[in-house]
């Protein structure tokens, strides 16, 4: 394959992606286009523009975009309709952001006439897979460059030397090894590596950046009411909000009460186990509330089927198959299940916990007259249960009879 002439780089403005930018220019002699996404990571992004210009990028080749609303509306919310948890615990905060970034890389490549895209994911992690599967799903002819799999800059010392040789500014706090690496967006903050690599040691307090220590959270609980329409949150405490605004507000509430901390050893798609510290305050509240509204609006058959496919759906997202036909097929089933998932849930926030305490809906299937312990005025005839039990017991009785005969 011929060397690329123009490359769109996923660019944060940090030291590593600045080194990648310069490496692409020197190694491939290509024109570089940068894309920086505002996913709600909480960083000022204009310095990324200034740094790109300083490194020789034409102003027209610098793309900085606020994609927070698209991220929550088109990626986070569809995932939350499924109550997706990878390995029963992980809310997929990093996994769900990668398809959007890769999608924009491919779209910008088409807009600018670039023939390749590049990312800064290492050769050991899942992100390289997620970026590249998305790129190839959207443009089979695109070339993907993964510098960490190609170059010889295999140590922090070599990276610093390359930066100094190429006049790339290095902040004083970037010269040494960071105690851990951080990835953040509006859904979560992920911390991995170095001081966290020994799973037998508790993570130090300074790792947590988005949530207060639950033991130091307010001594008074706080209640929040979340309104849903067809499975998506649309209002908080009666106030209609955009998707990104809802998640931002829930992050503030959850962080204040120490909600959403997770210390997890997970199975990476590439074959190894890794330890991560995840903070997902708003997402944890949202998941709890969504489950709460489903409890009264979703039929048991549909709900149990939906629960059974959730692990596979979550695994597809974790492994990078957002744009696969099987994920889209499952999404259609999940979205169908949400047609009546509308109503309001009250969640109690207290010292690390988010717990549903009330829920109501015009679409509710809950019938108090059927379930009451008091007189039900004929709504339910308890004698009907006898035939129901006899029919369900029939096969068990036949099995027991057979077993007794065989043993005899």
UniProtKB/Swiss-Prot annotation:
The primary site where this protein sits is cytoplasm
GO-annotated molecular function = argininosuccinate synthase activity; ATP binding
The catalysed reaction is: L-citrulline + L-aspartate + ATP = 2-(N(omega)-L-arginino)succinate + AMP + diphosphate + H(+)
The residues the entry assigns to the signal sequence are: none
Question: What Gene Ontology terms describe where this protein resides (cellular component)?
Answer: cytoplasm
InterPro entries hit by this protein: Arginosuc_syn_C, Arginosuc_syn_N, Arginosuc_synth, Arginosuc_synth_CS, Arginosuc_synth_type_1_subfam, AS_cat/multimer_dom_body, Rossmann-like_a/b/a_fold
Q: In which pathway does it act?
A: Amino-acid biosynthesis; L-arginine biosynthesis; L-arginine from L-ornithine and carbamoyl phosphate: step 2/3
Residues that bind ATP, according to the entry? 10-18, 37, 120
Keywords (A to Z) from UniProt: Amino-acid biosynthesis, Arginine biosynthesis, ATP-binding, Cytoplasm, Ligase, Nucleotide-binding
Where does it reside? Cytoplasm
Q: Can the keyword Amino-acid biosynthesis be found in this entry's annotation?
A: yes
**SUPFAM superfamilies from the UniProt entry:** Adenine nucleotide alpha hydrolases-like, Argininosuccinate synthetase, C-terminal domain
Tell me the GO BP annotations in alphabetical order. Answer: argininosuccinate metabolic process; L-arginine biosynthetic process; urea cycle
EC nos: 6.3.4.5
**Positions of L-aspartate binding:** 122, 126-127
Binding-site positions, L-citrulline: 90, 95, 126, 130, 181, 190, 266, 278
The entry assigns this protein to a family as follows:
Belongs to the argininosuccinate synthase family. Type 1 subfamily.
| Description of how the protein assembles with itself and partners | Homotetramer.
Q: What is this protein called?
A: Argininosuccinate synthase
